[in-house]
């Protein structure tokens, strides 16, 4: 659910979110949450637009939730990065001037980074040929972007099919490949604040870390520098490949990444059954003191929640405070909330990103 874009009301909206998080965590005697705000505009590093034809022209369009028939036609998007806003009108001029680029184009996606990279994905209801490739190569060079052309069963890459982000955590710069089509944190500034909070909350450890739902290694890279070694899990092939590249690019060599779900890992740790994907991984060699979880909106399922109970410290990043509270309630008899935080990843919506550190009683 969204609320109107109104920078003048930002502080009030953030306070309302803070009150809501405070209320949800009150039953667990949680400390006052640290609050990390967002830039008021140009904070979103990615944007996806359908194209809407009107008066023989195509316009960028978005739709209100639940209404895919009434387009909101856009010249720019104030919540999107300055780079996206600069690219939008130029790209539209170019496709309007080029029948090859324009023909059966129905969607345009932008992905940018704080480090200055940009990638545009153009989606078509037709096969893409050599003529399109030549026009796209010229366009990519002119705009200084990577360009992806997509149609059914086809993906043409001009440049690279990822962008590179650089984020500073505790004085060290980490480089992240963010692949086209994979999940990335949309608010880069707040993501940097989350990484630094998690790094500080975990602290310097002499034991090992288990990470569930590691994605492209967003948290894995900085947290790996705080522990002896890390076992990280992820099920998306695209994210696994990106995470492996990111570990290599940053010289992080104490992480083992396995393609298992949280449920499968629970079975492996409980020795319910062996997994071929764990071949060569000696689970008994790990001395896990902490677990890091960043689950989907549904939160942790009961079995995964029980798995985390066996760890002294649970570092939990949540995109849904209601399911976070439900998971804490399940763990509250053995773990207390030592730290909590609100990260305003999504200004002008009711969505909240939050974090807690749970420590065994």
From Swiss-Prot:
Database matches in PROSITE patterns: SAM_MT_RNA_M5U (PS51687), TRMA_1 (PS01230), TRMA_2 (PS01231)
InterPro entries named among the record's database cross-references: MeTrfase_TrmA_AS, MeTrfase_TrmA_CS, SAM-dependent_MTases_sf, TrmA_MeTrfase, U5_MeTrfase_fam
Keywords: Methyltransferase, S-adenosyl-L-methionine, Transferase, tRNA processing
Active site residues per record: 319, 353
Molecular function via GO: rRNA binding; tRNA (uracil(54)-C5)-methyltransferase activity, S-adenosyl methionine-dependent; tRNA binding
Keyword flag S-adenosyl-L-methionine: yes
Membrane-spanning residues: none
Enzyme Commission number: 2.1.1.-, 2.1.1.35
NCBIfam families listed in its UniProt record: trmA_only
Function: Dual-specificity methyltransferase that catalyzes the formation of 5-methyluridine at position 54 (m5U54) in all tRNAs, and that of position 341 (m5U341) in tmRNA (transfer-mRNA).
Protein name (database record): tRNA/tmRNA (uracil-C(5))-methyltransferase
């Amino acid at each position: 659910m969204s609320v109107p874009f109104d920078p003048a009301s930002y502080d009030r909206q953030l306070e309302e979110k803070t009150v809501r998080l405070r209320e949800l965590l009150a039953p667990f005697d949680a400390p006052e949450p640290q609050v990390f705000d967002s830039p008021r505009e140009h904070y979103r590093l990615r944007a996806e637009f359908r194209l809407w034809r009107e008066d023989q022209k195509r316009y960028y369009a978005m739709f209100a939730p639940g209404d895919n028939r009434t387009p909101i036609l856009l010249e720019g998007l104030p919540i999107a990065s300055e780079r996206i806003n600069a690219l939008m009108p130029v790209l539209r001029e170019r496709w309007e001037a080029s029948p090859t680029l324009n023909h059966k184009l129905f969607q345009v996606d932008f992905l940018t980074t704080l480090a200055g990279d940009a990638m545009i994905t153009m989606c078509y209801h037709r096969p893409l040929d050599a003529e399109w490739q030549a026009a796209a190569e010229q366009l990519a060079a002119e705009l200084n972007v990577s360009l992806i052309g997509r149609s059914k069963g086809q993906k043409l890459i001009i440049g690279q099919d990822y962008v590179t982000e650089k984020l500073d955590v505790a004085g060290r710069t980490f480089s992240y490949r963010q692949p086209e089509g994979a999940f990335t944190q949309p608010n880069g500034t707040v993501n940097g604040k989350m990484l630094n909070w998690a790094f500080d909350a975990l602290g310097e450890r002499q034991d090992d870390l288990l990470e569930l739902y590691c994605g492209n290694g967003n948290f894995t890279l900085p947290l790996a520098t705080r522990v002896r070694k890390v076992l990280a899990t992820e099920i998306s092939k695209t994210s696994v490949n990106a995470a492996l590249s990111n570990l290599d690019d940053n010289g992080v060599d104490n992480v083992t990444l396995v393609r298992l779900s949280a449920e499968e890992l629970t079975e492996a740790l409980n020795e319910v059954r062996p997994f071929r994907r764990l071949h060569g991984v000696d689970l008994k060699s790990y001395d896990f003191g902490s677990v890091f979880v960043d689950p989907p909106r549904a939160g942790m399922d009961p079995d995964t929640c029980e798995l985390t109970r066996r760890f002294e410290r649970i570092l939990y990043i949540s995109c849904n405070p209601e399911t976070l509270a439900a998971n804490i309630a399940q763990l509250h008899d053995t773990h207390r909330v030592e730290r909590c935080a609100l990260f305003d990843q999504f200004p002008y919506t009711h969505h909240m990103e939050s974090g807690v550190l749970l420590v065994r009683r």
